[in-house]
């Protein structure tokens, strides 16, 4: 404690000290202020908060293996995925497929389940691409007698299958092609206000196109597909989902099609070392021998009449923990690495798969959320789910900035010290804030056994004032300090086979919205409709119940009918008229905003 002299001589010094201190505090936020604002973990960013983000593949809900009233569907909105690719149920067809849409010759229809799923995606902020596929036995069966109806394939059906009535027989004759394009035209027009991206087929270069991928046949079908899709204003064409980065297949398909100017997106898939542990960066050096996604994109961009702004989707990517030499810890490192590696190259990545339908032929291997196996861990996230939630929060709505660089004498030694390439990329958010991602492109081993190295980095052109270190897999955030006397150099930074990121302490500038309620169920008793659901995290302060009245001619709009306490898990609606067809959903709210909505339930009032 400072005790003033009797003559008061300390007072001028105290006033001067306080004035200088105040001026310093007004100039820039102090280190202490930055530390006080810093979260311990990466705050999640929901789909509704993102304009341009990463993608996920998903089957549409289907009982009994993917029931909509379990907690899996809404988690893609909570985790901040912005794009979704639909059209397959595992390796079979789904509700958007030709054998589902046209079940009687010349009669096209959607289903309430499909309409509700699409509404859920669009209303919760997702951008949707649909694969239009496969064959239809009324037209493409390899039988001298064609059936008069199409019975959709079960979820257990999968390639390779060359039986007479397999849906993998493609439309190749003029009559078959015309029938396929009628299905395409009806579907694109029906969803024109909700879905704008349409892909032709899936992995047409392998066993999804019988008897085996045929580039010339695919090119012929692509010609009329481009014209059919573009008849609907705003609809975009995706060259759909080539399984391997074969330049020869693409070249022959485009040469046959002569429709390069009509392709809006080129899509391909990457599973480096399918079935075994190969790090994602090997997609461009070794996983495909003399082929690579980089070389494939170069071929496409140099194709005559191709659009100069053509988009590239890596719309199936994963490296699953059950593959030989891998585990869940390897997957949690590899998948974010693949996303950011592609992001720096301008490629949008779609992870395969949200949740596995275990009636398919790939068990419960691919889902970032576990599927139904009748265990207590059913529909629980794998570690990679949280790593992707962190990736989405940090890098959605960012653009690669080549002027941001990581340099330093230590950096050049990292490949020699580790035997693996060192990768670093700088990005800027939509508000101009910089974030730097770095890692060693290592072959990771099970059990988190990689030995962490340490290095000094000099960051160029970031504008970062109060640097923080972010572990993308764990989500941990730690405050850093610039090397004394510098504002761009950081010492003793950990470098490993997992993505670390450096940003400013004020990078986390988004509010945390509640997680969506899930597991909505509905029953009725007399003229009362009873609802029940589950509420989750994100500090919900209210639960809102919404209702929509259905009719044969039109779908009504959603109306809020109740606002309940955050602990509420049920509600009874007594304002029901006899014969009404009703749909319900619920969402959570807090002071920052609202969650995504739950699954939709329907019921007819008695």
Model-derived segments and spans:
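Boundary/entry segment of secreted carbohydrate-active catalytic domains
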Residues: 35-89
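Substrate-binding cleft and catalytic face of glycoside hydrolase catalytic domains
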Residues: 79-277
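Noncatalytic carbohydrate-binding groove/subsite architecture in carbohydrate-active enzymes
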Residues: 215-341, 345-350
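Aromatic/acidic polysaccharide-binding cleft in carbohydrate-active enzymes
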Residues: 323-415
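Carbohydrate-binding surface patches
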Residues: 410-463
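C-terminal beta-strand-rich structural cap/linker in extracellular carbohydrate-active enzymes
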Residues: 479-513
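Pro/Thr/Ser/Gly-rich low-complexity, intrinsically disordered linker/stalk tracts
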Residues: 511-539, 578, 592-606
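Beta-strand-rich modules
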Residues: 573-593
């Amino acid at each position: 404690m400072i005790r003033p002299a009797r003559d008061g001589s300390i007072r001028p010094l105290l006033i001067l000290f306080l004035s200088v201190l105040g001026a310093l505090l007004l100039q820039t936020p102090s280190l202490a202020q930055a530390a006080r604002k810093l979260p311990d973990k990466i705050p999640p960013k929901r789909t509704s908060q993102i304009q341009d983000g990463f993608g996920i593949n998903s089957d549409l809900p289907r009982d009994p293996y993917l029931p909509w009233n379990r907690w899996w569907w809404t988690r893609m909105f909570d985790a901040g995925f912005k794009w979704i690719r639909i059209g397959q149920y595992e390796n079979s067809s789904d509700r958007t497929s030709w054998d589902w849409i046209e079940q009687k010759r010349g009669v096209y229809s959607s289903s309430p389940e499909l309409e509700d799923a699409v509404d859920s995606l669009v209303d919760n902020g997702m951008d949707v691409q649909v694969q239009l596929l496969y064959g239809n036995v009324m037209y493409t069966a390899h039988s001298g007698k064609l059936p008069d109806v199409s019975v959709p394939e079960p979820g257990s059906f999968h390639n390779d299958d060359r039986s007479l009535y397999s849906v993998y027989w493609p439309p190749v004759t003029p009559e078959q092609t015309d029938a396929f394009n009628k299905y395409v035209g009806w579907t694109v027009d029906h969803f024109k206000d909700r879905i704008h991206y349409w892909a032709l087929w899936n992995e047409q270069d392998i066993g999804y196109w019988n008897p085996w991928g045929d580039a010339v046949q695919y090119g012929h079908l692509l010609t009329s597909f481009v014209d059919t899709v573009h008849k609907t204003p705003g609809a975009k064409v995706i060259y759909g989902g080539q399984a391997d980065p074969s330049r020869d297949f693409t070249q022959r398909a485009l040469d046959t099609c002569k429709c390069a100017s009509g392709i809006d997106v080129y899509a391909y898939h990457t599973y480096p070392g399918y079935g075994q542990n190969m790090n994602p960066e090997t997609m461009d050096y070794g996983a495909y021998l003399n082929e690579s996604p980089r070389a494939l994109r170069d071929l496409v961009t140099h194709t005559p009449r191709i659009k100069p702004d053509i988009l590239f989707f890596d719309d199936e990517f994963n490296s699953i923990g059950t593959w030989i030499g891998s585990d869940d810890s390897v997957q949690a490192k590899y998948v974010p690495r693949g996303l950011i590696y592609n992001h720096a190259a301008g490629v949008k990545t779609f992870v395969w798969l949200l949740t596995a339908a275990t009636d398919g032929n790939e068990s419960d291997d691919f889902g970032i959320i576990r599927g139904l196996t009748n265990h207590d861990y059913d529909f629980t996230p794998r570690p990679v789910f949280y790593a992707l939630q962190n990736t989405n929060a940090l890098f959605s709505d960012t653009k690669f900035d080549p002027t941001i660089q990581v340099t330093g004498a230590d950096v050049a030694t990292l490949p020699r010290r580790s035997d693996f390439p060192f990768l670093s990329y700088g990005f800027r958010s939509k508000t101009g804030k910089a974030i730097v991602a770095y890692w060693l492109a290592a072959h990771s081993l099970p059990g988190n056994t990689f030995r962490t190295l340490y290095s000094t980095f000099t960051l160029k052109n970031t504008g970062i004032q109060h640097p923080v270190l972010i572990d993308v897999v764990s989500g941990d955030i730690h405050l850093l300090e610039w090397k004394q006397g510098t504002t761009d150099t950081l010492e003793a930074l950990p470098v490993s086979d997992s993505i670390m990121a450096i940003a400013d302490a004020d990078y986390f500038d988004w509010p945390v919205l509640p997680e969506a309620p899930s597991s909505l169920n509905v029953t009725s008793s007399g003229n009362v409709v009873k609802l029940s659901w589950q509420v989750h995290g994100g500090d919900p302060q209210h639960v809102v119940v919404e209702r929509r009245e259905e009719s044969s001619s039109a779908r009504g709009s959603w109306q809020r009918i109740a606002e309940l306490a955050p602990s509420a898990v049920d509600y009874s609606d007594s304002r029901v008229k006899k014969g009404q067809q009703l749909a319900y959903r619920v969402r959570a709210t807090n002071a920052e905003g609202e969650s995504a909505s739950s699954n939709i339930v329907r019921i007819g009032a008695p």
